[in-house]
Amino acid sequence: MAHLLSASCPSVISLSSSSSKNSVKPFVSGQTFFNAQLLSRSSLKGLLFQEKKPRKSCVFRATAVPITQQAPPETSTNNSSSKPKRVMVIGGDGYCGWATALHLSKKNYEVCIVDNLVRRLFDHQLGLESLTPIASIHDRISRWKALTGKSIELYVGDICDFEFLAESFKSFEPDSVVHFGEQRSAPYSMIDRSRAVYTQHNNVIGTLNVLFAIKEFGEECHLVKLGTMGEYGTPNIDIEEGYITITHNGRTDTLPYPKQASSFYHLSKVHDSHNIAFTCKAWGIRATDLNQGVVYGVKTDETEMHEELRNRLDYDAVFGTALNRFCVQAAVGHPLTVYGKGGQTRGYLDIRDTVQCVEIAIANPAKAGEFRVFNQFTEQFSVNELASLVTKAGSKLGLDVKKMTVPNPRVEAEEHYYNAKHTKLMELGLEPHYLSDSLLDSLLNFAVQFKDRVDTKQIMPSVSWKKIGVKTKSMTT
């Protein structure tokens, strides 16, 4: 199990048993402590274990191989003389979470990562692999320390285990929690019954535990929760930022904007939003829900500092996002896979803007009892528009880019009205990176650089919204 959770970590692992209550201690430039019990009683149980095994109290201690390179601490860009704010990044080993953790650390926040590393396990289970080779979380954090002098603490465990999460909260005492720690793929949630159940249990129960942890151990803590623009669906009216004012039968009220989720994943995000809104009202929690659009790109200033800091980039049909997938398809000469009519329109943003938006939300926290909703994207594109942009950019690089129409595996409108508001983050200072020719060139060149790592069998969609069933499905057969 430890091997699965940190498959690429060059570490020394020892196992000790104890009848006493396990304590949670952070990784700080060299050590990790995580509780194996939490995995056996969490939502990971069905994914990790093929048969029931006796439970025992144990603690894994993994000591990362030390890195000798050391740099002096970087001068802070934060002019405040007060104690640096402490930010817990849940899901900090993932695509958006890793980039965010590094960005906040560089900005002089005290950062810890909480992660069960299950995203890496999904790759093992489904036969998938990031386009980019990624280092273990232990090597990543050690390299960051060596290059910048800044420490990132690491708590390896499952937030669906409240005891683990509570101990992490009490140990780190965060001022803000950035919550990326959810199963984030709509196709994954539609593979079969077990993945649908896992997605909803992991996401909804995990977020509930975070809310209870804030209530019990950090009532002033600000929750920055990553939601999704997919909560709204594709209504035939403008999409507002979280709330809409309605006049009905002569009476007017401002209400939460209607939700029309299109997968079990998106539904889990809707449930999260309702639970967070309720606890803000009932308990006075302060929360910001960032309804994020589709993220593209892989490079940030921090992840480009060293190859061991490199972020993952998914190109497969389960975890890959549209623009990233198209660029990889173009790089290997595979026709761009346009689902259905290709008129599906969504909000998009560069990963550099993801980290910027999170920083803005932390620096401008919600008030006590306030449930604040920001729509987090910078531009809108249809699938056909993205395909045209990639085709044009690819031709400049000498790539022969073609397009193919694929029967849509999803249940969604393929031609529709779409106009979503996204002004609140701009008003707070977001400086967006718009999709430009130079950015597309960079992303395409990056895909070409690693094209030998592409498994073309993973490009075509194999998950159907209508064919989901009870039987557990293997993606490798």
Swiss-Prot record:
Changing residue 228 to A: Loss of activity. It is an enzyme of class 3 (hydrolase). Its cofactor is NAD(+). Induction: Induced in response to altered availability of inorganic phosphate. Pfam families: Epimerase. GO terms for biological process: cellular response to phosphate starvation; glycolipid biosynthetic process. Residues 1-86 form a transit peptide. Concentrations above 100 uM sulfite inhibit the reaction. NAD(+) binds at residues 95-96, 115-119, 158-159, 184, 202, 265, 269, 295. It comes from the Eukaryota. Optimum pH is 7.5-9.5. Substrate binds at residues 184, 228, 265, 292, 322-325, 337-339, 410-412. One of its GO terms (cellular component) is plasma membrane. CDD domains: SQD1_like_SDR_e (cd05255). One of its GO terms (molecular function) is zinc ion binding. Belongs to the NAD(P)-dependent epimerase/dehydratase family. Involved in the biosynthesis of sulfolipids found in thylakoid membranes. Converts UDP-glucose and sulfite to the sulfolipid head group precursor UDP-sulfoquinovose. This is UDP-sulfoquinovose synthase, chloroplastic. It comes from Arabidopsis thaliana (Mouse-ear cress).
